[in-house]
Amino acid sequence: MSTARTENPVIMGLSSQNGQLRGPVKPSGGPGGGGTQTQQQMNQLKNANTINNGTQQQAQSMTTTIKPGDDWKKTLKLPPKDLRIKTSDVTSTKGNEFEDYCLKRELLMGIFEMGWEKPSPIQEESIPIALSGRDILARAKNGTGKSGAYLIPLLERLDLKKDNIQAMVIVPTRELALQVSQICIQVSKHMGGAKVMATTGGTNLRDDIMRLDDTVHVVIATPGRILDLIKKGVAKVEHVQMIVLDEADKLLSQDFVQIMEDIILTLPKNRQILLYSATFPLSVQKFMNSHLQKPYEINLMEELTLKGVTQYYAYVTERQKVHCLNTLFSRLQINQSIIFCNSSQRVELLAKKISQLGYSCFYIHAKMRQEHRNRVFHDFRNGLCRNLVCTDLFTRGIDIQAVNVVINFDFPKLAETYLHRIGRSGRFGHLGLAINLITYDDRFNLKSIEEQLGTEIKPIPSNIDKSLYVAEYHSEPVEDEKQ
């Protein structure tokens, strides 16, 4: 059987509202078992993640003393080598090494201990320019190493002798803020005192105020909360030298654009602005013209969809959707799956249906309490459940590398939404599967999205080749069909 199943699923955790409907998770190995490599990655994530009411605090500083002449690489605690196939989204590089950028040794140690062996294309393009202090407008696919592309130069440029906020990363969702802060903390752990803080709406404001009373070098935040802290005079940003807008298209949409304008006005005039996104609508161009000074433009988007994601559709009626999902669960070899619905109400209804079928699942949406969202995100990322039902809350930048299947239970209306949804699989050049349940009313949308993205969504075959989305079916890396 492809996913965890029990005859009597039970609700576990804080309450039924916390998004955790789960039975026991099937052991790794065998059909749907995930394999040893995925399990090792989950264990690494489990060790790395800490959540404290939405505020990430630097773990006890790790200062590594290395004597002159020591081979410092021998002291590293490297994760298991990732032997899964990778596509040219992340392998078509210029052959640079992280050492080529003259980074601090302590930062290099954190990079290598993250399992980052060589810079991806977006990192090769971005890191040297960001280190020079120039503004950047970067367009690259989700899941190709954007976080590292800005966090590495950001950390390199910190002056740890100073006790003020020197860099800010603004992201559109709380979950993404937690994820980016965890990465930042891990990469900087050998730097001996780099203080990283995440602050988001929905968490205790008093805790954030107390945290900012101590030294903080890097703030990773959602727009509304950081602007609130700036206006209260708690977050002092007069020494900020770099601000990053991750998922810039969302941050500069109608929901956030005025808040972002207000934040920029509080910063020094000589600050550096880095914009990263997969899509750049007119709102981003307008912001760029107003605030960026001769930006260096990076465009790694000759095609929009990830090379490693195979896309299918199944033509169904609304009443057939749950039965079709049940069939997919039984036939696919799922490491972890994310299932998208178009409303919070449908998320909860579907999660309940899935548990009634005997499969364990979590669910998450924007109307849940923040502590429940944090718990679901943390536990799913750590591999405690195989299936997650969610809204588009979970599309922006969330990186869970064990996810190899994305299912659009409800087909999205916008091409941009579709692009971000299917980008939850096939992360960092790995393989993934995107399956769309299409009703009669969705048929025009399907055609429109194919045309806008320049991609092909094929009818689902009776048997899906496991080599398209299961890493263990590749004994050695292969190139993209000779390109």
Curated annotation (Swiss-Prot):
Q: Where does ATP bind?
A: A140, K141, N142, G143, T144, G145, K146, S147
Give me the Gene Ontology terms describing cellular component: cytoplasm; cytoplasmic stress granule; nucleus; P-body
Matching entries from Pfam families are given as: DEAD, Helicase_C
Main EC class of this protein?
Answer: hydrolase
Q: Where is this motif: Q motif?
A: 96-124
Q: What is its EC number?
A: 3.6.4.13
* Region annotated Disordered, chain positions: 1-39, 55-75
Checking InterPro entries in the record gives: DEAD/DEAH_box_helicase_dom, Helicase_ATP-bd, Helicase_C-like, P-loop_NTPase, RNA-helicase_DEAD-box_CS, RNA_helicase_DEAD_Q_motif
Q: Which GO terms describe its biological process?
A: miRNA-mediated gene silencing by inhibition of translation; negative regulation of translation; P-body assembly; stress granule assembly
Report the SMART domains cross-referenced here: DEXDc, HELICc
Span of domain Helicase ATP-binding: 127-298
Compositional bias (Polar residues) = 55-66
State the reactions this protein catalyses.
ATP + H2O = ADP + phosphate + H(+)
* Residues spanning the membrane: none
Q: Which PROSITE patterns match?
A: DEAD_ATP_HELICASE (PS00039), HELICASE_ATP_BIND_1 (PS51192), HELICASE_CTER (PS51194), Q_MOTIF (PS51195)
**Family in the record:** Belongs to the DEAD box helicase family. DDX6/DHH1 subfamily.
Summarizing the function annotation, the protein's role is: Essential for the formation of P-bodies, cytosolic membrane-less ribonucleoprotein granules involved in RNA metabolism through the coordinated storage of mRNAs encoding regulatory functions. Plays a role in P-bodies to coordinate the storage of translationally inactive mRNAs in the cytoplasm and prevent their degradation.
Please state what the protein is called: Probable ATP-dependent RNA helicase DDX6
